[in-house]
Amino acid sequence: MFLGTYTPKLDDKGRLTLPAKFRDALAGGLMVTKSQDHSLAVYPRAEFEQLARRASKASKSNPDARAFLRNLAAGTDEQHPDAQGRITLSADHRRYASLSKDCVVIGAVDYLEIWDAQAWQDYQQTHEENFSAASDEALGDII
């Protein structure tokens, strides 16, 4: 399970050090993909394969489903952390998420999100006030 907030730095080569507590879960390979809110999502390979299989079952005649699948597949990069637990984020991913040197990695239960630190701060300021109301609306009786 991926939980918590971490603040690694992006180096000049586009490498980001993953939090040590997640490295074992990601050692077998991981998938970095574009996510909502101009962040990046990092999935263990097996978890991403399940997501991709579910997405590929959507009707190919539905233009929204085709667009989602195209964006998912085209915007995904397979990575294997190096001995120091670093992954290299592509220039396209760094641009998409507007990543600067200061990044935030957050646990999102079954995957990680990578944010630019300022973008994450802005997101939190905008959405934190609505957290209680949003959780009631979005999750209903689940929690």
Swiss-Prot record:
Q: Which UniProt keywords apply?
A: Cytoplasm, DNA-binding, Repeat, Transcription, Transcription regulation
Give all residue intervals belonging to the SpoVT-AbrB domain.
Answer: 5-47, 76-119
Q: Where in the cell is it found?
A: Cytoplasm, Nucleoid
One GO cellular component assignment for this chain's record is: cytoplasm
Q: Which InterPro entries match?
A: MraZ (IPR003444), MraZ_C (IPR035644), MraZ_dom (IPR020603), MraZ_N (IPR035642), MraZ_sf (IPR038619), SpoVT-AbrB_dom (IPR007159), SpoVT-AbrB_sf (IPR037914)
Pfam families in the record: MraZ
PROSITE patterns in the cross-refs: SPOVT_ABRB
What is an annotated GO biological process for this record, any one? negative regulation of DNA-templated transcription initiation
- Name a GO molecular-function annotation: DNA-binding transcription factor activity
Instruction: Please tell me whether the keyword Transcription is annotated for this protein.
Output: yes
Q: How does it assemble?
A: Forms oligomers.
Q: What family, per the record?
A: Belongs to the MraZ family.
Name this protein carries in UniProt: Transcriptional regulator MraZ
What is the source species?
Answer: Mycolicibacterium paratuberculosis (strain ATCC BAA-968 / K-10) (Mycobacterium paratuberculosis)
- This protein's gene is called mraZ
